[in-house]
Amino acid sequence: MQGDPAGALKIYREARSRYARNKALLYGQIDAQLADGQAQEALKTTTAELQLTPSDPILHGLQARSYAALGKRLQQHRAQAELYALQGQLVAAVQQLELAQKAGDGDFFEHSQVDARLRELKIRQQEEAKQKLPL
């Protein structure tokens, strides 16, 4: 299947019709969509699945790859930040959101969302730093 993304995609779709909630098949389907140049379809799939399971770091990573393939840098960094935040890597998450702020794309609404999430994560960073201080 490595050299045949379209064939792999067909197999994943058939398998998912039988096992719709199987995460491994879902991830494989999205990966095959990206390999087949179907970044917009991959983005639709990740976005729909994230509505159901917003705390899935793998989906956020696949969404970041989808945005990257579409050239949407702000959204790419934002999705990557969510992946890092879910993994507890707050420093990396903050860095990604700072990159998102500097991205030359995105509209006012998207920038506002990035700014708000950046504030949230910085507060969380400060709270965690306070908890680590010796008494």
Indicate where each model-derived feature is located:
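Canonical positions in the second alpha-helix
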Residues: 15, 48-49, 83, 100
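Structural register within alpha-helical repeat arrays
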Residues: 29, 63, 80, 99-100, ...
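Alpha-helical linker/edge segments of TPR/alpha-solenoid repeat scaffolds
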Residues: 37-40, 69-79, 109, 119-135
